[in-house]
Amino acid sequence: MAVPREPDQVVRLFLDLMERRQLPEAQALLAPDFAMTFPGNVSPPSLDALVEWAKNRYRFVRKTYEHVEVCGTDHEHAVVYCSGTLSGEWLDQTPFEGIRFIDRFELRSGLIRRQSVWNDMALHTIPQP
């Protein structure tokens, strides 16, 4: 897998790989000290743990990007913000769409060091199977 040089392209590749559940390839884009935080102060210790946590929330989720912004211009350190909406399917196979999200990524030396996630998913009723 060719790793992009531009911070926004690294982030988009990571998110695309995560959506397809290509975890080893996604892991290759992460710094050794990578940390992630999701709504409710959930901080899964690994990508595998994130997927396990998500299994209790929805069957799948996709992102539609409205904005991707890069702060910082050098490749040593950059912050990338992605915002848009989530769509997918709840556990009972009911579709959802239009749920707002913002992801903030910190990159150092071309690798993702931190991901912080905010979304409005909690404002929507999550049907149970």
Residue ranges and their predicted role:
Residues 74, 91, 108-109:
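Flexible loop/coil segments at beta-strand boundaries within sensory signal-transduction domains
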Residues 14, 26-27, 34, 50, ...:
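Hydrophobic pocket/interface hotspot
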Residues 54-57, 84-98, 117-124:
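A structural preference for long, well-packed, hydrophobic secondary-structure segments
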Residues 63-67, 96-102:
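Short, surface-exposed coil-to-beta transition loops
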Residues 100-128:
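Short beta-strand edge/turn micro-motifs at domain boundaries
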